[in-house]
C-alpha cells in the first residue's frame, strides 16, 4: 500500500524525532509518498518561522523531489469538507486524510487529532509516535 505524509511526519523527520524520523526516511528512500500541497505549505511556513525563508525554500525543494505532490481538485475539496464536517480536526489535517484516502494510501502521522480518530477516518493511519 502506498504511503502519504502529513506535516507532523515531515516536521518530525526534519527534527530527527524518533521513531518517526527513521520511518519517514525509510518511506522516502523506497517510494515517493503522497503529500498534499496544503501540507507542504504548512511545513514551509513552520520551517520559515523557526529557521528563516531560505531554509524553508531549501526544505520545500528537497520535499518536492522526494514526494508525489497532490494539488487538491474539486473532488478532493468535497472530501475535505466532508471530513471537516464530521470530525473535529484541523483543516490541513483533513487535506492529509483526503489525500491518503484518494490515493488508497496509509497516512503516516503522529498528530493526536488524527491518530485518536483513526478508526473513524476514510484511510488507514500509521502512528509514528514513540510506543509507551
Q: What spans do the regions from the language model cover?
A:
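Acidic catalytic patch
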Residues: 64-86
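Conserved SAM-binding loop
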Residues: 13, 69, 107
Amino acid at each position: 500500500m502506498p504511503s502519504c505524509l502529513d506535516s507532523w511526519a515531515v516536521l518530525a523527520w526534519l527534527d530527527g524525532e524518533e521513531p518517526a524520523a527513521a520511518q519517514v526516511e525509510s518511506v522516502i528512500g523506497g517510494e515517493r509518498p503522497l503529500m498534499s500541497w496544503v501540507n507542504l505549505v504548512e511545513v514551509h511556513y513552520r520551517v520559515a518561522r523557526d529557521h528563516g525563508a531560505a531554509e524553508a525554500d531549501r526544505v520545500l525543494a528537497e520535499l518536492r523531489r522526494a514526494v508525489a505532490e497532490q494539488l487538491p481538485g474539486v473532488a478532493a475539496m468535497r472530501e475535505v469538507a466532508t471530513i471537516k464536517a464530521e470530525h473535529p480536526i484541523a483543516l490541513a489535517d483533513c487535506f492529509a486524510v483526503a489525500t491518503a484516502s484518494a490515493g488508497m494510501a496509509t497516512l503516516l502521522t503522529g498528530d493526536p487529532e488524527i491518530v485518536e480518530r483513526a478508526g473513524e477516518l476514510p484511510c488507514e493511519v500509521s502512528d509514528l509516535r514513540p510506543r509507551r
